[in-house]
Amino acid sequence: MVKAIKVMLIPNNVQKTKMFQYAGASRFAYNWALAREIENYEKGGGFISDAGLRKEFTKPRHSDEYAWLLNISNNVTKQAIKDACTAYKNFFRGLQKFPRFKSKKRSMPKFYQDNVKIRFSNTHVKFEGFSSSRKANKQKMNWVKLAEHGRIPDRKSVV
């Protein structure tokens, strides 16, 4: 069973910048996948699966124009592409309206983090990929401070 706990974070300026970079990459991947699906549909092609789009996304990710994407965790863009495909499928099933492109101004900045790769302490939380090397990722400066202490139960207190 996975339990969700909503917590408030207090990131420093470097961490805040990194979070906005993650959200921007997520928005970029979502918009790219949606544009690719629309383009394919207009040409008379069928639905492209999220696995196919993720394979296609590696080309722009490794190009010089989008080199900034290499600093972002792969899981962030992967989940954004999955979300775009799900929204597109739901439209054709008649469950939702046509998916809109994500705007920097209108959309709420958000990104995906794999729940297995998040680490918690009593006072801090560490996200996946906040630094470029494993050694730097273990340092305390990469841990984001929690606003409420003791809100997340320790492994000892979980039964």
Which functions belong to the PLM regions below?
Residues M1-V159:
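Nucleic-acid substrate recognition interfaces
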